Design a protein with these regions (language model features):
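Terminal-tail/helix-coil boundary detector
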Residues: 197-206
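GST-like domain detector, emphasizing the conserved glutathione-binding G-site
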Residues: 1-125, 129
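Conserved beta-strand edge residues that scaffold enzyme active sites
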Residues: 32-34, 180, 200
């Protein structure tokens, strides 16, 4: 399999998942410059993903998957021994619920406008208001919990990648103590720390 990523983008969630699954030998990591739409070997990334965004995953069958909500559960299912996603039932639906919340209420609603130089002041103001409500909801859920579900899952990988952006937009997670404690706890996990350190190095070198 080939995983297409850009350093410190939301594709960090997929790298965390790969490392958590111990799947480095099964998945090639392909870096993408989202500004030039080229991979590091010069290939046209839009020929792989017409949307030009990361992540994208080439499956063993040669299919291309895009979007975190599709890629992360797929990766978890390829390596079931790692227990990174519930196999079915209500817990699988709860995983989908959290992936949807992270993607829509935090990633796109909060951080995309705050990180974009094209977003106007009104959009950024709305994003900060949404951050307050979204992180408050998350904080309430995480009180007394180590992870979003009963154990570390691909939803935690995605949430960690998104919360990592807070440092770049002036959001202090300490305002939400349970979120701050969660972020510190998850980023201390060896596979998460490794993924973040590697991507920070690539980001700084870009």
């Amino acid at each position: 399999m080939d995983l297409y990523f850009s350093p410190l983008a939301c594709s960090l969630a997929s790298r965390i998942t790969v490392y958590a699954a111990g799947a480095e030998g099964s998945i090639a990591l392909r870096q993408v410059d989202t500004k030039t739409q080229k991979t590091v070997d010069g290939a046209d990334y839009r020929a792989i993903n017409a949307k030009g965004m990361v992540p994208a995953l080439r499956t063993p069958a040669g299919d291309i998957l895009t979007e975190n909500a599709a890629i992360l559960p797929f990766l978890a299912d390829q390596f079931p021994a790692a227990n990174l996603a519930p196999a079915g039932g209500i817990e699988r639906s709860r995983l989908a619920q959290w992936l949807s919340f992270i993607g829509s209420e935090l990633h796109k609603t909060v951080f995309t406008p705050l990180l974009s130089p094209k977003a106007n002041d009104g959009a950024k103001t709305y994003a900060r208001e949404a951050a307050t409500s979204g992180l408050a909801y998350l904080d309430a859920h995480l009180q007394g919990r180590d992870y979003l579900l009963d154990r570390f899952s691909v939803a935690d990988a995605y949430l960690t990648a998104v919360l990592n952006w807070a440092q770049f937009v002036g959001i202090d997670l300490k305002a939400w103590p349970s979120v701050a404690a969660y972020y510190a706890r998850v980023t201390a996990r060896p596979h998460v720390a490794r993924a973040m350190q590697e991507e920070m190095g690539l980001f700084q070198a870009a």
